[in-house]
């Protein structure tokens, strides 16, 4: 046990070196490995005091100062996380998933806390909400960013923002889609590679968000509410027939927009399986048609009042689940893409929910007990670094198992007698567990090597 634990500590120390090198001061360089290992290690609570107690090093004051009170810039470490995440799972076949996660809280003093919808509880609750970016390839997610959303009750109260230490650049009211676009820009600037941006209807409803992704030349597939308006793909702009009143000066569409669910009412639906789950293949019925989204400039159309003109062409996709639930999506993916591929891309978004759950249940994302902006974001950053390390170990183990399987298959093939040829089917690594299990008993904690 001791040997294995020391090996793990050594591996963590080596893996953390690029992050530690960006921290500057010697004390911060020593506290970072301690904090990360405290998050990964055993214990029900991953806040500063219980972690310091488990370290048995009397490090509470220094750990607390490192996370909550120290004066240091987190952005270089955040950039390093983007670089390391791209090395782990980046590529054109990766997806970037936009979502948010709620951290239930008591009281009113923790930064950003307010009565708002908490997805983890399925209702409105007193909580903090953090916009998240998750990079995923296959079934391996790595969290890239967690940025706090500030409700109006906070952005309208400068004294409250000052007490929580909110930086000046973040005191202006920003919607969740606006925060997401800013974090996407940060990821792109760091060279993170991905093929498609995915988001749920909370973001897909926002025309500026969709248009912002398109302006950045990004492929996207987002959830939308069933009532979002669209036009047929072949809608034409015509000169309106003159009637009473002043003559019209602008073209109008030759057909009115309609709700997404109505556009798919007579579509052809197909049963599609997109991946295997613990209880077998995951299936649903899908349909897709090309449309033009009603997110152009608003204009009065005949006697129907103001309507948005046709915007860019996109896929409108519907999903009928076995439970009876219906979901709708928009995607600016290529017009020649087949329905099965569209469905597979859309359903890849589920991986971020697994990442949120693991960050909370195994690494204590929602255990931070401080009230400040910097403290919350530094704690969140350390949990993301810990998560990235565990995914690094997960991928390393999978590659080793795959190599061993191939070696065994080659040996078996070599032992076969001539005259009995058999087709050789390539093997793959066994399904990987969500996160690698670490030793529950720890001989010692990582020490500073830098």
Kindly label every feature range from the protein language model.
Residues 35, 323-349:
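Extended, non-catalytic structural segments that build the interaction scaffolds
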Residues 129, 351, 355, 377, ...:
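Catalytic-loop motifs flanking and including active-site residues across diverse enzymes
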Residues 2-198, 202-222, 226-229, 236, ...:
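Conserved, well-structured functional cores that handle cations and Mg-NTP chemistry
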Residues 134-136, 277, 319:
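A generic structural motif
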Residues 39, 43, 55, 67-70, ...:
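Generic structural signal for hydrophobic core residues of well-folded globular domains
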Residues 30-34, 49, 327, 340-343, ...:
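Non-catalytic, well-ordered alpha-helical scaffold segments
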Residues 1-27, 39, 150, 157, ...:
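A short, flexible helix-boundary coil/loop motif
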Residues 98, 102, 203, 251-262, ...:
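Short amphipathic alpha-helical "interface-anchor" segments enriched in bulky aromatics
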């Amino acid at each position: 046990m001791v040997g294995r634990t020391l090996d793990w500590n050594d591996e963590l120390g080596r893996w953390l070196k690029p992050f530690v090198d960006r921290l500057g001061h010697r004390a911060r360089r020593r506290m970072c490995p301690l904090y990360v290992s405290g998050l990964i290690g055993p214990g029900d609570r991953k806040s500063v005091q219980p972690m310091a107690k488990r370290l048995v090093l009397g490090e509470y004051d220094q750990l607390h100062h490192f996370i909550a009170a120290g004066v240091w810039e987190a952005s270089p470490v955040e950039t390093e996380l983007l670089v390391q995440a791209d090395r782990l799972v980046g590529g054109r076949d990766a997806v970037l998933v936009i979502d948010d996660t709620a951290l239930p809280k008591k009281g009113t003093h923790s930064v950003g806390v307010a009565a708002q919808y908490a997805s983890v509880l399925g209702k409105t609750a007193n909580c903090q909400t953090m916009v998240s970016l998750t990079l995923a390839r296959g079934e391996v997610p790595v969290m890239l960013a967690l940025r706090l959303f500030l409700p109006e009750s906070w952005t309208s109260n400068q004294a409250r923002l000052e007490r929580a230490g909110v930086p000046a650049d973040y005191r202006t009211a920003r919607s969740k889609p606006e925060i997401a676009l800013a974090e996407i820009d940060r990821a792109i600037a760091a060279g993170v590679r991905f093929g498609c941006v995915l988001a749920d209807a909370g973001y897909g409803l926002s025309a500026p968000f969709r248009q912002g992704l398109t302006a950045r030349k990004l492929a996207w597939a987002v959830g939308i509410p069933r009532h979002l308006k669209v036009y047929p793909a072949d809608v034409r702009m015509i000169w309106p027939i003159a009637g009473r009143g002043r003559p019209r000066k602008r073209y109008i569409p030759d057909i009115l927009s309609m709700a997404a669910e109505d556009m798919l009412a007579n579509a052809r639906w197909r049963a599609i399986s997109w991946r295997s789950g613990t209880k077998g293949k995951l299936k649903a019925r899908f349909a897709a048609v090309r449309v033009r989204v009603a997110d152009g400039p608003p204009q009065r159309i005949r006697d129907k009042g103001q309507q948005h003109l046709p915007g860019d062409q996109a896929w409108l996709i519907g999903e009928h689940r076995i439970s009876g639930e219906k979901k709708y999506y928009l995607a600016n993916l290529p017009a020649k893409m087949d329905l099965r591929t569209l469905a597979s891309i859309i359903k890849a978004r589920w991986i971020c929910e697994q990442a949120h759950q693991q960050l909370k249940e195994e690494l204590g994302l929602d255990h931070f007990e401080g009230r400040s902006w910097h403290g919350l974001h530094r704690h969140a950053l350390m949990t993301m670094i810990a998560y990235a390390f565990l995914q690094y170990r997960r991928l390393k183990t999978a590659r080793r198992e795959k190599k061993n399987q191939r070696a065994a298959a080659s040996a078996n093939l070599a032992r076969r007698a001539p005259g009995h040829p058999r087709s050789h089917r390539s093997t793959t690594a066994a399904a990987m567990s969500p996160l690698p299990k670490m030793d529950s008993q720890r001989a010692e904690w990582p020490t500073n090597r830098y």
